[in-house]
Swiss-Prot record:
Signal peptide: none
Gene Ontology molecular function terms on file: hydrolase activity; serine-type peptidase activity
Task performed by this protein: Cleaves the carboxyl side of basic amino acids, small neutral amino acids, and Met residue. It is also a plasminogen activator.
Subunit structure: Heterodimer of a large and a small subunit held together by hydrophobic interactions.
Family as reported in the entry's similarity comment: Belongs to the peptidase S1 family.
Note: Activated by sodium dodecyl sulfate (SDS).
Gene Ontology biological-process entries: fibrinolysis; proteolysis
This protein's record includes keyword Transmembrane: no
Enzyme Commission no: 3.4.-.-
Source species, domain of life: Eukaryota
Every Peptidase S1 domain range: 1-25
Name of protein: Fibrinolytic enzyme large subunit
């Protein structure tokens, strides 16, 4: 997920948080 705002089915909050912070996704 690029942007990490909307969670896709199967994504969980800690994954979204790490994606937003790292910015590598």
């Amino acid at each position: 997920v690029i942007g990490g705002t909307n969670a896709s089915p199967g994504e969980i909050p800690w994954q979204l948080s790490q994606q937003r912070q790292s910015g590598s996704w």
